[in-house]
Amino acid sequence: MANNEDHSEDSNLNGEDSFETVKQRLKDRSKKVVQTRDLLSKQAVQTREILSKQAVKIAKQAEEHERFINKVTHLVGVLGFGGFCFLLGARPQDIPLVYCFFYVIFVPLRWIYYRFKKWHYYLLDFCYYANTIFLVDLLLYPKNEKLFMVCFSFAEGPLAWALIVWRCSLVFSSVDKIVSVLIHLLPGLVFFTIRWWNPETFAAMHPVGTARRVSWPYVDDKPYLFTWLFLIPLVVYTLWQVLYFLIVNVLRRQRLLRDPEVMTSYRELSKKAQKANNKLWQLSGILGDQNRMWMYILFQAIFTVATMALTVPIFLSYRLHVIFQILKISAAVWNGGSFLLEVMPRQVIQKEKKKKTEMQPIEEQLPAQHEPVSPPTHYEAESTTET
C-alpha cells in the first residue's frame, strides 16, 4: 500500500511538473509572438518612415527641376498623342491594346502617387470601377455583345460627359491631367473603333456567304437595346454606389474623420462648391447641411441616368457618334488652353510670391551674420590696452 501511495504521489508530482512546463512553454511562445509582432511593427514603421523620406526627397528634387520636367512631359505628351492619332487612323483594331497597356501601367502608378498625396480614395470613383469592367471585357470577353453594350453605355455616358461637365483639361505638361483626360476619353474611342472601324471584328462576326453588317453588334430589337444600354448598366451603377457608400461612409468613416487631409470626391466637390457658393452648393443644402452627401448622391444618380439615356441614339447613329467624339476632344483641348492661359500664370505668380516670402527671413539674417567688422577706434584701442 505504501508503495502504491508513493507511486501515486510521484505521478501527481510528475503531472504537476508537466503541466507547469507546458504552461511555461505557452508563456514563452506568447512572449516570442509578442516580441516578433513588436519587431515587425517597428520594422514596418521604420520602412514607412524611410519611404516617406524618400518620397519627400524625390518631391523636392522634382520641384528643383520642375521646368525641365514640364518640358520633357510636354514633349512626350505631344508625341504620344500624335502617335495615338496616327494609330487611330492607320490601325484602329490596335486601339483596345493601347488602352489596356495604358490602364495597366498608369493606374497603378497613379495609385502610388495618390497614396502619397492622400488622394487614393479617388480611385474608388465610378470612372475607375467602369474602366476595370472595360479591361475585363476587352481581355476576357471581347466577343460578348451584351457586356460590350454595358461598357458602351458607361464609356459614352457618365465617363464621356464627366469629361465635359467637370472640365477635364488636356495639358501636355502635366502627367496627372493627361491621365485624367485619357481615363475618360480613351474608353469611348475604344468602343467607337470596335463598333464602327474594326475590320477584324467584322470579319469574325460575319459568317462566310452572308452580307456584311455596317456595325458590331447589330441590334434591331428596341427593347433589347434599351435593356442592355440603359437598365442593366443602371443596375451595375447602383451596385457601385452601394459599395462606395459602404467603404467610404461606413468602413472608413473614422479614418476619414481623423484625417481631414485625406480627400474624397465628395470632400473636393463640397469644398469647391462652398468656396464658389455656386448653385450646386445652394441646391445641396436644401435639406440642411447634414444631408448634403445624400443630395450629392442624388445629383450623381440623375446625371448618370440622363447620360446613359443619351447613349441609345449615339449607339444607333454613326454620324452622331463621330460628332460626339469631336465634341469630347474639343472640350478637353479647350479646357487645356484655358488652364494654360488663365490658371497656370496665376500659379506661377503664387509660387514666385511664396519663394520671396520664404527667402526674406534668410536675406534679413545674412547682413547680421556677415556684417564686416570695423577696426577699433583710438579710444577703443586705449581702453583695451588699459584693461
Curated annotation (Swiss-Prot):
The lineage of its organism: Eukaryota, Viridiplantae, Streptophyta, Embryophyta, Tracheophyta. Residues 89-93, 142-145, 195-227, 317-319 are lumenal. Glycerophosphocholine acyltransferase (GPCAT) that utilizes acyl-CoA to acylate glycero-3-phosphocholine (GPC), forming lysophosphatidylcholine (LPC). Shows broad acyl specificities with a preference for 16:0-CoA, polyunsaturated acyl-CoA, and the hydroxylated ricinoleoyl-CoA. Also catalyzes the acylation of glycero-3-phosphoethanolamine (GPE) with acyl-CoA. In addition to acyl-CoA, GPCAT efficiently utilizes LPC and lysophosphatidylethanolamine (LPE) as acyl donors in the acylation of GPC. It comes from Brassica napus. The keyword Magnesium does not apply. Its main location: membrane. The keyword Lipid biosynthesis applies. Belongs to the GPC1 family. One of its GO terms (biological process) is phosphatidylcholine biosynthetic process. It is an enzyme of class 2 (transferase). This is Glycerophosphocholine acyltransferase 1.
